[in-house]
Design a protein with these regions (language model features):
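Short connector loops at secondary-structure junctions
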Residues: 64, 215, 250-255, 405-420, ...
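Flanking helices and flexible, charged tails adjoining ferredoxin-like Fe-S electron-transfer domains
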Residues: 200, 364-373, 383, 396, ...
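A short helix-to-beta-strand connector/capping loop
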Residues: 305, 437-444, 478-481, 555-557, ...
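N-terminal Rossmann-like dinucleotide/flavin-binding domain of flavoprotein oxidoreductases
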Residues: 412-458, 570-596
């Protein structure tokens, strides 16, 4: 019997059956607009279908040019587009899967000048102001949705998902925040929800009755003047009556200032929201957000919070998620850690999606995994992210890999990251690598510091020896008050009540998060997370915001973060997560000061110049987070001995601690060697 009986139970939809309860949620990949995008998307989706996903939803495709995500974005409004899409649907069907096209009109979020919305109100995350739709333009758009659905059916899709959540066009009609009309498309809620209902009716009429229609409904807007639970319930009933097959419950607008999918969000944090609709409708409900583990999904389904679970990024992290779970090999799942660094953060700067823990995601055709033509004896020095990625992938191809590390455990910088409140998921990546090292027969030698002579018998050596913290040239840098971030995070050096952190990059923010944490991290407690971020769990307020707002605990220490640069502290943090770290630290009372000159460190504290004024920061500790130097001492003697040496990870480029680059480097080299 399966360990996950609810997860692998089929779902009967009347005219078709889904083989299990998992939806691969919509993700824009950046492939949708590329010349070879159809081939790459076909490979991407087909691999997930092959391993058992019941129903895949594509990235959002606009029904009209006004609704694209950005200039040049993908549209499906003409038969000339069908061949592109048939390539994708054929590939999925050949693997026994089903696939639905997401119809997405981005409304006032469309990042191009010709955007439209119910009212001419600029979104806080867009520099363009939308044109207010006329009555006739609204009718045309409804027909555009229906036409897009018809074309999707002709292209071989098994259904469509009508995107009515996350603050996009349909959601904008629903909320008083963005709909200030006083005609038949605005005013009271009955008129505000008319557009959504008419879209679903038109889609059903045009696409036929034996066609899946998922409606993504915003359950929890997390913005002021959003929808109430009563309104959401009324809409859900109307959407069912209009012809939807399934309702997928969305959480949060893109402009919301509450985290909904990043690592600090507890697993399955919002399934309780979906459950509130269970008695209101008779069609299946999908719950979503931070479901990255088969047991979490099973528990949600078993207690009746939803009929299906949606997972998106977990299928970037591991295409084999479902087959591994079904074969009772969940320990081999490469878990999504919710970092967003290689997926959403790349999409928002116009790059193709990938995955920090799985660089092959969306690059399957460019990074094939082939058996090694001539297996080699390979030495890998350093069991951090880069070395682990190389060792596992090279061994999987048939190479004989020996992995050395001077420390008693694998992980390198990930052993630092996993201690940061809100980054507990990094434990999962190390669990995955430990499992795969054993599975692929890597000879792991911990507590082993090697010399160049120890490596001479190997065919090639891969140096993944990482970095050493860099100490800036400040008078008094050797004072007992001074600690490196490794002293604090790895060695647990005592830290006093008043702290200055030099450096506002990623490691500086991590150190500040660690030192400012009071009690247990809310990333492990859904109730406390909702309280901390001001989510009204009764759902009585419009938008689901608690009247008292966020309740983030104050730091037990006085902390000031400093940087030499005049730019905003944390400017280099991820676009989708940096604001969370800044907001958290500021709410805790942490100060951030740019454009600082460091004069000296002595018994009194840290002497600085800020804005031309000399100041004394009377602190107990000065924690240095000001960059790092590569550790590559073994490279020159090995090369002098005529050996082939490869540098990956921090020992190659130490400018920033970049796990995405490190794992990608290790993986690419392993697939090529």
């Amino acid at each position: 019997m399966s360990r996950y009986p609810s997860l692998f139970a089929p779902l009967e939809l009347g005219f078709t059956t889904l083989k299990n309860r998992v939806l691969m949620g919509s993700m824009h990949t950046g492939l949708e607009e590329l010349p070879d995008g159809a081939q790459r998307l076909a490979a991407f989706y087909a691999e997930r279908a092959r391993h058992g996903v019941a129903l895949i939803v594509t990235g959002g495709i606009a029904p009209a040019p006004s609704g694209v995500t950005m200039a040049g974005g993908a549209v499906l409004n003409d038969a000339s587009h069908l061949a592109h899409h048939r390539h994708i649907t054929d590939a999925v069907h050949q693997e026994g899967g089903k696939i639905a096209l997401q119809i997405l009109h981005t409304g006032r979020y469309s990042y191009q000048p010709a955007l439209v919305a119910p009212s001419a109100l600029q979104a806080p995350i867009n520099r363009f102001t939308p044109h207010e739709l006329s009555h006739d333009e609204i009718l045309t758009l409804i027909d555009d949705f229906a036409h897009c659905a018809q074309l999707a059916r002709e292209a071989g899709y098994d259904g469509v998902e009508v995107m009515g959540s996350e603050g996009y066009l349909i959601n904008e009609f629903l909320a008083a925040r963005t709909n200030q009309r006083d005609d038949q498309w605005g005013g009271d809620y009955a008129r505000r929800m008319r557009f959504a209902i008419e879209v679903v009716k038109a889609v059903r009429q045009r696409a036929g009755h034996d066609f899946i229609i998922i409606y993504r409904l915003s359950m929890l807007d997390l913005v002021n003047d959003g929808s109430t639970l009563a309104e959401v319930t009324e809409l859900a009933k109307a959407i069912e009556a209009a012809g939807a097959t399934i309702i997928n419950t969305g959480i949060g607008w893109h402009e919301a200032r509450i985290p909904t999918i990043a690592t600090p969000v507890p697993r399955g944090a919002f399934s309780w929201v979906t459950r509130k609709l269970k008695d209101a409708v008779s069609i299946p409900l999908i719950t979503t957000n931070r479901i990255n583990d088969p047991q979490v999904a099973e528990d949600i389904l078993a207690r009746g919070d939803a009929d299906m679970v949606s997972m998106a990024r977990p299928f970037l992290a591991d295409a084999e998620f479902m087959s591994k779970a079904q074969r009772d090999r969940a320990g081999e799942i490469n878990t999504c850690i919710g970092c967003n660094q290689a997926c959403l953060d790349r999409i928002f700067v116009g790059k193709v999606t990938s995955c920090l823990v799985n660089p092959r995601a969306c690059h399957e055709t460019l990074m094939p995994v082939l058996p090694a033509n001539a297996p080699k004896r390979l030495a890998v020095v350093g069991a951090g992210p880069a070395g682990l990625a190389f060792a596992v992938n090279a061994a999987a191809r048939g190479h004989h890999v020996t992995l050395f590390d001077a420390l008693p455990e694998i992980g390198g910088q990930f052993n630092i990251a996993k201690q940061i409140p809100g980054k507990e998921e990094f434990h999962e990546t190390l669990r995955y690598y430990r499992t795969m090292l054993d599975l692929h027969g890597v000879d792991l030698r911990l507590n082993t510091r090697v010399t160049a002579d120890d490596l001479l018998t190997f065919d090639e050596t891969i140096l993944a020896t990482g970095i050493a913290p860099r100490l800036p040239a400040i008078d008094g840098i050797d004072h007992p008050k001074v600690l490196s971030y490794l002293d604090v995070l790895r060695d647990k050096a005592p830290v006093g009540a008043k702290v200055a952190i030099i450096g506002c990059g990623g490691i500086g923010f991590d150190t500040a998060m660690y030192l400012s944490q009071s009690g247990a991290a809310t990333s492990q407690d859904i109730g406390e997370f909702c309280r901390e971020w001001g989510i009204d769990t009764s759902l009585q307020t419009a938008g689901g915001l608690h009247p008292e707002g966020p309740q983030l605990s104050k730091s037990p220490r006085q902390i000031v973060m400093l940087q030499r640069k005049a730019s905003k502290p944390g400017e280099g943090l991820g676009k989708t997560t940096g604001w969370i770290h800044r907001a958290t630290l500021l709410a805790r009372g942490v100060k951030m000061i740019p454009a600082v000159s460091y004069e000296k460190i002595d018994d009194e504290g840290l002497h600085v110049t800020i804005g031309g004024e000399r100041q004394l920061l009377a602190v107990d500790q000065v924690v240095i987070c000001a960059g790092q130097e590569p550790r590559r001492e073994l490279a020159d003697p090995l090369r002098a001995a005529g050996k082939t040496v490869h540098l990956i990870g921090g020992c190659d480029v130490a400018a920033e601690l970049d796990a995405r680059r490190a794992i990608a480097q290790g993986t690419k080299l392993a697939l090529a060697i």
